[in-house]
Every structure is written in structure tokens, then in C-alpha cells.
Amino acid sequence: MLSLKKSALSKLTLLRNTRTFTSSALVRQTQGSVNGSASRSADGKYHIIDHEYDCVVIGAGGAGLRAAFGLAEAGYKTACISKLFPTRSHTVAAQGGINAALGNMHKDNWKWHMYDTVKGSDWLGDQDSIHYMTREAPKSIIELEHYGVPFSRTENGKIYQRAFGGQTKEYGKGAQAYRTCAVADRTGHALLHTLYGQALRHDTHFFIEYFALDLLTHNGEVVGVIAYNQEDGTIHRFRAHKTIIATGGYGRAYFSCTSAHTCTGDGNAMVSRAGFPLQDLEFVQFHPSGIYGSGCLITEGARGEGGFLVNSEGERFMERYAPTAKDLACRDVVSRAITMEIREGRGVGKKKDHMYLQLSHLPPEVLKERLPGISETAAIFAGVDVTKEPIPIIPTVHYNMGGIPTKWNGEALTIDEETGEDKVIPGLMACGEAACVSVHGANRLGANSLLDLVVFGRAVAHTVADTLQPGLPHKPLPSDLGKESIANLDKLRNANGSRSTAEIRMNMKQTMQKDVSVFRTQSSLDEGVRNITAVEKTFDDVKTTDRSMIWNSDLVETLELQNLLTCASQTAVSAANRKESRGAHAREDYPNRDDEHWMKHTLSWQKDVAAPVTLKYRRVIDHTLDEKECPSVPPTVRAY
């Protein structure tokens, strides 16, 4: 076995002669040479290595891997950068399934799926993107099956589909739809491993445990990304004709969330620092069933299999809030109902501050076959046997509907300063939770997230194939490109203030949890803006204790905090300015949806932490890609 010294020079020598190498006990496959041309930063402190690729994908979750292997399969020299091993990406935690109108359990139609998604979005979703996603869903699932995703099966061998919230037949006029394709309750795990295998098969070049710092831009065009290799301390500049951001959400801006600790909004913050906008950050989804005390997710599939919520009186209270859909109403509806029950004194437990999810009435064989993962999770994190006891649950931050404004074909957007119309950002694309396509609008339907990853990761590859020739030479660029990013890294690595990263991060999380929560008012949101601004200012007083460049977790966590603060601040300001209730944005002082004034996307700009947040707005796309194929869905009252 090869030994690997910690100097960059010995590592580069090793990589010239092998496609696999060892680091500690971990063997990584790079699927190609990762050495490039070497240089030094202007001050001589940092060893810089340059690479040239057709396409660079930042993030190796479901969206990033689907885009990466699609690009590599099409003949593009493709790099995929990830700050952790790909199969540890947060997609692995997705449980319930992936939506598609396959019709395996009953007659179904992708147009019904589209209707449900538009309604679920509370008419903030762009209908051209929703049209594309729901139409492409069935063929995307069949592709996944061919790639090797081991879907659960019906008795006749078809892909098993379960019920999820907000899904109906006949444009909302029919009964509950069974549209969610599942791999028991470990769908994300199966999907992620399958996509990683495909990416390796198609010779994607992986740069694992590289932390993406900033986008490289020149004359308004995104020309690549600069990253920090945590293993040896080198800085890498990746030149690319297309840079694809697939870095996930920023759930860790909140105190209680279902997100992995790595969900820190890195891609969103990079876009913001580059001077481009983010969209609809005020829309943060609270999942109804996070385990009380830990935040671990209990899939909506548990209710889809027949589970139900009860309060301290043993009442199935969702029948009062959503008489038709009951426990399978949309997530924002269920989360608000739980919060109202707790407020009115019907919570359970000593503090009466949570609810119960009842599964014990389900046959043990159903729990074993369909919900093995959550049975284990409930035992470990709640100490309950689901065959005998209810699971204590509480609404928990789960998903960011907002992100990088993106067209249905994956191209990132800004707005033209002169005309106010949409304008494509040259060289930049996005997909997955980091993007705002916007198929989820103000509220995401359960199991549309994995579909989003697959459909729009695939769309990115198709768009690039239609617009870019493989192997084109790169234009000359300034030799000091990325110097601001290196200066920021150096500043944070040597920061000698009085506040730890952990202290500032905790203050941020508690502020967001308290002031930008399930129910919002002008006073709570204004206080949230003041508080998060005060927290941002303390970032200038941050202290890092580790000055090294090798496996410096203190530095990485400080960089992540910088990214989280950028996302948190824009979330609070955007929420304070939207004076209506729509989807996950529930204002007690503005309880109604206001289509006349607020059926529009929020765009927010912030160049750096503690800089002012600027807001503008762009129209919601209320037409489909082809009105003859699929007419748009006009706004109506959203009730379940």
C-alpha cells in the first residue's frame, strides 16, 4: 500500500502515477489525474494548483452526481468537487421516496401531478419548470431503475408507490394519489449510491474533501471555482466553461433541523459574494415530524402508510384543519396545525410542547417491510418501540425552497438592470436544493425533492450538450484571479478575535429559530433582522485557534459560518418585507395570500457578511412550456 506524505509535492508526484491513493484508512478513486499547473500566491503563503475542465460540478449529492455523470457520459471533461465523501452527502438521508405519475397503483397522469405541485407551491412556483419536472418524472424514474436503483415492488413486480401529502387524482377532485416511488424508507440512500456508481463508471474526476471557497468571475462571466484541499492545504483553481452549483440547502442556520451538519449554504453564499442574487429565501419548510429533542426526520411516508397524529386528548386533530386530506395535507398546513395545538394547550409530554405520531396500529410486517429505517431511528433517538408506543414529534426545519434563481434548463439567472427582465448569468448553472427553479414555490410537496435532483441534474447535462462543444480551449485570464478569496481565507485562518465560531453560530441558530419560525409577525421579523444583523457584526470578532492548513476543522467551520450568516440574513430581511401569508411564510398579521401585490419572487443581494441586503422582485412564470400540451393552473383558494 502506498504511503502518502503531507507535502503537496509528494502528493502530486504520487498522483501522476496512480488513479487511486490512500489517505489515512480511506481509499478514494479520483478517476483521472488531479494534478495541474502549480504556482504560488502573490505573498508566497499558498501553494496554488490550476486545472482546466469543460465543466465543474460543486457538490456530490443527488443533483451534483446526476449532472456530473450526465456530462461525463456526453463526452465532457468533468470535475466534481465535494467537501465530503459523495455517499455521505445529505441526499443519503432522504427517506420516503420520489414522485412520478407511473400509475402502478391506480390510473395516474403527470398533469394531475403538475396540478398538485402548483397548488402545493401556493402559486409561487414557475409553471414552465413544474410542467417540465412532472412531464419528465416518469422517464427519469425508469432511467433510475435501469441504472440500478432497487425500488420496492408490488406483488406483480412493478415499482411500489405510496401516498404522500398534497397528492390527488383528477386535478384535486379525486381521492388520495399513490404516486411516491420508494425504496422502503431509505430511498435517498439507494439513489445516492446508484448515482455515485454511474459517475465513477463514466470517468468523472472527483476532488473529494475539497472545500469550494468562491466562484471565479471575469467580466461578468463565471469561469470556474477556487477550492481548498483539506488534506494537504493546497489551493486549487478550476477553470470551466460551465460551473454547476449543487451544494444543497442551509438548514443549519436554524437550531432545530433535519439537515446534516454539512448543509451550510456554501453555493448560495458563493453566488451572493460574486454579486448575483438569491431568490425566495423567506420560504423555509418546517417538516411536521422531526423527532422531539433531536430533530431527526420521521418520513412523511409513515403517514402515507397509515400513521396519524394525535394530541394530548388522543384526538386525530388534523381532521379539524384539513377535513379531506387529514394527516396527508401539505407540510406547511400540518406544521401550522401542530403549532396551533401546542399553543392551545393540547401538546403532549411534561412541557406539553410536542405531539405524537401513532404507528402502533399498523401490522408489524408493514413496519418491517415499508418503514424499517424509521423504526430503528425512533428506537435510537426517541427510545420508543413503534409497534407499541407513539413517536414524539415536532415541526423541524427541513428544506429551503429558495436558492439560486434558475431556469427550467439549469441556467442561473439575474435580472437586467435596464429592462428588469430575466438575464442568464454566463457560465453558471445550478440544480437541486441550492437552486430555485422554482418548482416548489412557497411550499414543497413531499418526495418532489428527489425528483427535483434527478430531473434538473439531468436537464443541466442536456442543456450543456446542446450548447457547448467538448474540449474548447479556455480564454486567458488574470494570473491573480481569486486573490480576494485567498485573502478572505487567510484572514479567517489567522483571526484573533474574542468570540469562538461555535458561540457566534449558536447565536445565529437561536435567533433564526425564535424570530423566523413557523408563525411570523412584523415585530418578530423586525426583531429577527436586528438580531441577525447584530450577530453578523460579531463575525468581525471571530477567533480561530488552529493556524494550520491541513485538516483544519476550525477553519472549515468558520468558512461555513460565513456562508450560513449570508443566507440567514437574507432570509430574515426577505421575510420581513413579504407582507402576506403564502405557503411556508405564515404571517399572523397578514393571514391571507395577496396575489395582486405579492405573486412575485423575492430577489436578494448581499456582497458579504454584515453588508446591507438589497431586495428586488421578479415575476412568477404563470404559463407552461406548451399551453396546448398542458394548460397552466390559475390561482384559487388553497384548501385540503
Curated annotation (Swiss-Prot):
Family label: Belongs to the FAD-dependent oxidoreductase 2 family. FRD/SDH subfamily.
Location in the cell: Mitochondrion inner membrane
Note: Present with 10400 molecules/cell in log phase SD medium.
SUPFAM superfamilies xrefs: FAD/NAD(P)-binding domain (SSF51905), Succinate dehydrogenase/fumarate reductase flavoprotein C-terminal domain (SSF46977), Succinate dehydrogenase/fumarate reductase flavoprotein, catalytic domain (SSF56425)
Entries under NCBIfam families matching the protein: sdhA_forward (TIGR01816), sdhA_frdA_Gneg (TIGR01812)
Organism the protein comes from: Saccharomyces cerevisiae (strain ATCC 204508 / S288c) (Baker's yeast)
Coiled coil location: none
Annotated protein name in UniProt: Succinate dehydrogenase [ubiquinone] flavoprotein subunit, mitochondrial
Keyword check for Chaperone: no
Keyword Transit peptide in annotation: yes
This protein's UniProt keywords: Electron transport, FAD, Flavoprotein, Membrane, Mitochondrion, Mitochondrion inner membrane, Oxidoreductase, Transit peptide, Transport, Tricarboxylic acid cycle
Residues the record lists as binding FAD: 59-64, 82-97, 266, 433, 449-450
Pathway: Carbohydrate metabolism; tricarboxylic acid cycle; fumarate from succinate (eukaryal route): step 1/1
Tele-8alpha-FAD histidine modification, residue list: H90
